Amino acid sequence: MSAQPISDFHAYPDAAGHFGKFGGRFVAETLIAPLQELSAAYDLARQDPAFIAEYDKDLKHYVGRPSPIYHAERLSREVGGAQILLKREDLNHTGAHKINNTIGQALLASRMGKTRIIAETGAGQHGVASATVAARLGLECVVYMGATDIERQKINVYRMQLLGAKVIPVTSGSATLKDALNEAMRDWVSNVQDTFYIIGTVAGPDPYPRMVRDFNAIVGREARAQMLEDYGRLPDAISACVGGGSNAIGLFHAFLNDPGVKIYGAEAAGDGIASGRHAASIAAGRPGVLHGNRTYVICDDDGQIIETHSVSAGLDYPGVGPEHAFLSDSGRAVYQGITDDEALAAFHLLAHTEGILAALESSHAVAQSIKLAREMPKDALVLCNLSGRGDKDVHTIAAREGMVL
């Protein structure tokens, strides 16, 4: 916990990219100049009315924003307790929140004169969103993806290829998201003159955590305005899944200075925290440096990263965005572990009661929202970020339940 209460959470990060003791820029000398170039370009763009107007236009006419808030009435009745509301990011073009960020970064890449974009992906949604905007803007696109994730997300791999992207399997380490990010960083160092690296989450060295947050903050700004317009008040609690944490910080940011709104993040507890097979960096990690920033990481006593596990490829990451680490330490947000089984149960319950197939990532937040709702009065409001749709996960769920499709 922080020694003194924080009056303005929107004042972070500081000029050096720090969220309290987290964040920063811990990278090899070869990346300092590219990061400085990127930071300067972003700081100019974010203050340019023409850039903002182009971004807003694409969000409306290409992505399909605003995404609605849906009252899950039958789910709420089934669960008992508070009313569960869903922020429907699954209805965006490409089926998740990821395109909010890739649109912004791709426009910035074009503004900087870059002709090639690279990306890492876990569940494949960020890869699809990157390939999508690359096709629209006429940019070459290369996506790095762990071989393990390629096996469990074959549909998204083919979607990327249909969009013209080259998907490169990564077989090092655990062959998942962290390894894909490592390979993408290596590519960027070697090809920085013409290449822009679109990181998909609020991790990495500064300016990535704040830049990805800013491009996703539309989620929370919309949600806050929609709550006031449709319900006449703010929600009592908000919930989102947290791997790196881009969808979560996108929702959380607009509510950080609203003390009456409780904030909850759902981490991937996998087979249970005690089992050691999980990806709950805040619940079971310790401070360390990963992918260029200081945050909570899952590591051994020697500081070596431990292999993580989650049924959800998008949450299978041994770190968390530095702003989430900061929000946890400050006490502003509470992060809880949701197991694979709890997420799958929530997936099925939402499908049966509301006719919505949520992504496995999002199903962790649905499970958390169900737990919260059960402990709250009937007139309370819980807003859950439904960050993506579950079409991509149907084969994974079927295989886990013994079905061959």
From Swiss-Prot:
InterPro entries listed in its UniProt record: Trp_synth_b_CS, Trp_synth_beta, Trp_synth_beta/beta-like, TrpB-like_PALP, TrpB-like_PALP_sf
Cofactor list: pyridoxal 5'-phosphate
Keywords associated with the record: Amino-acid biosynthesis, Aromatic amino acid biosynthesis, Lyase, Pyridoxal phosphate, Tryptophan biosynthesis
Residues recorded as bearing N6-(pyridoxal phosphate)lysine in the entry: 98
Any single Pfam family the record assigns to this protein: PALP
Protein name: Tryptophan synthase beta chain
Superkingdom, natural source: Bacteria
Gene, per the UniProt record: trpB
Subunit structure: Tetramer of two alpha and two beta chains.
